[in-house]
Amino acid sequence: MNEDVRLVAWVRGRVQGVGFRWFTRAKALEIGGLSGFALNLDDGRVQVVAEGAREGCQGLLDWLQGDDTPGRVDGVTEMWDTPRGSYDGFLIR
């Protein structure tokens, strides 16, 4: 079963000022069926919120944790929840 879920991920490392949010949005659009956003946080992390099919959210998480991201990812903290359905598209904030 590929139910809809909400993924919240906090990405640590050198992830600001390197196009990380732009590439995250591009990857979400490439996967398709995801809505949400990528946001720079004041502490240097990037927060990624994605809602959609579990398979798509897992694909985005796998990409965030992989070696194909811009900058340098030192770690990703994730949280899974039920979707809120309050996003239209995938935005850079």
UniProtKB/Swiss-Prot annotation:
Q: What class of enzyme is it?
A: hydrolase
Q: Which PROSITE patterns match?
A: ACYLPHOSPHATASE_1, ACYLPHOSPHATASE_3
Q: Per the record's keyword annotation, is Hydrolase included, yes or no? A: yes
EC annotation? 3.6.1.7
Q: What Pfam family is a match for this entry?
A: Acylphosphatase
The organism's place on the tree of life at top rank: Bacteria
Q: Which UniProt keywords are present, listed alphabetically?
A: Hydrolase
Name of the featured protein: Acylphosphatase
Q: What is the lineage of its organism?
A: Bacteria, Bacillati, Actinomycetota, Actinomycetes, Kitasatosporales
Q: Which gene encodes it?
A: acyP
